[in-house]
Design a protein with these regions (language model features):
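Residue-level preference for nonpolar/small residues embedded in alpha-helices
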Residues: 6, 41-42
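Conserved dinucleotide-binding and phosphotransfer motif residues
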Residues: 53
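Conserved glycine-rich beta-strand-loop-beta hairpin in the small C-terminal domain of fold type I
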Residues: 3-11, 22-36
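A short, small/polar-residue-rich loop/turn motif at beta-strand boundaries
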Residues: 43-48
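Conserved PLP-binding active-site segment of the aspartate aminotransferase-like
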Residues: 34-39, 56-91
Length: 94
């Protein structure tokens, strides 16, 4: 399906951007993925910064060392996968 290809493209982009220090889980519906990545600050800060760049983030889980973010194929167009991942990477590594 078109959505499956889109999800694969998103997953590849996330892997290219974040490398081996991230965990990716595909959502049950096959339209989204959960990205777990080391992050020391609060999810609220991340959401605020992302919003300033026009990106709305859905945070699934937060603990002391990592954060899990939901990335949805339906809310990001394929052309935007790379810029979205780059932006996220910049925000996470601030």
């Amino acid at each position: 399906s078109c959505m499956a290809q889109k999800l694969k493209a998103l997953e590849n982009e996330v892997r290219n951007t974040f490398g081996s220090n991230c965990t990716i889980q595909t959502g049950a519906a096959g339209t989204s993925l959960a990205l777990t990545i080391p992050y020391a600050r609060t999810g609220l800060e991340l959401k605020k910064e992302a919003r300033m760049h026009g990106m709305s983030l859905l945070i699934l889980e937060e603990n002391a060392a990592t954060i899990t973010i939901l990335l949805s194929c339906s809310s990001i167009t394929t052309d935007d996968f790379a810029p979205a991942c780059q932006l996220l990477s910049r925000l996470l590594n601030k």
